[in-house]
């Protein structure tokens, strides 16, 4: 039986961000500076991606008050739920090259729903190595128990992922 091959997502060259709009039209952008992720090449030729975002470190650059809100119990509630996780269902490598959808389980605040990341077509022949794999996925925060601030913040949170893989060392 063939084993899966694992590739680590490169934390130095990758970025996991998000944006949410206020009811007044302002866009708030944040990111997760600490994360772990991997791409698995499955024995049947499909791929699967998994990542864990450290929500305790979520940041809205230059906006300390917004950063505190995002970490607080009304949003990510990092004291109780320090990690945001995504595990895709298996998909073909063509999705990353040509663009398409990657669906999987997203867990925020201990609540899991199936969500979809929309991958843009690659700008190179070795996506993840020679160019970023770029995907976006929009979720409704209310589905994850983040119902506070409805008068000020929209319900849609868009995750923007720009990923690179670590190169295997060559002998």
What is each PLM-predicted segment?
Residues 1-171:
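Low-complexity, acidic/polar, glycine-enriched regions of mature
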